[in-house]
Amino acid sequence: MSRSDFATDAVFRKEAEEVLEHLLQQLDEIDYDEFEPRYTSGSLSLQFDNGTVVMLSMQTPTHELWLSANYTAWHFLCTNGQWIERDTSESMLTILSAIISEKVLQQVHLV
């Protein structure tokens, strides 16, 4: 898989920040008591009531978004406008939705 859709680090950072902010907005609208989403420059974290943390962060040198949860890590490249896991070709939104759904015991669908 190629490095990503982005020609420069600045373009990657701009697009990645927009994706993270969009996800934060969706997560804020879900309004579950089981977790608290937080966005800081370059990363989005979800702190769950049981103490677990899900972290999605930008990795500028590789033009990837990295997700860590449940002792597992995923690396996403943007290909044709979609964030796809570089080893499994799964959608970032599908994986993140499944992780959150498992934690809150309800179906969550991020778009």
Regions found by a protein language model. Give the residues of each.
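N-terminal intrinsically disordered, cationic/polar leader segments
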Residues: 2-111
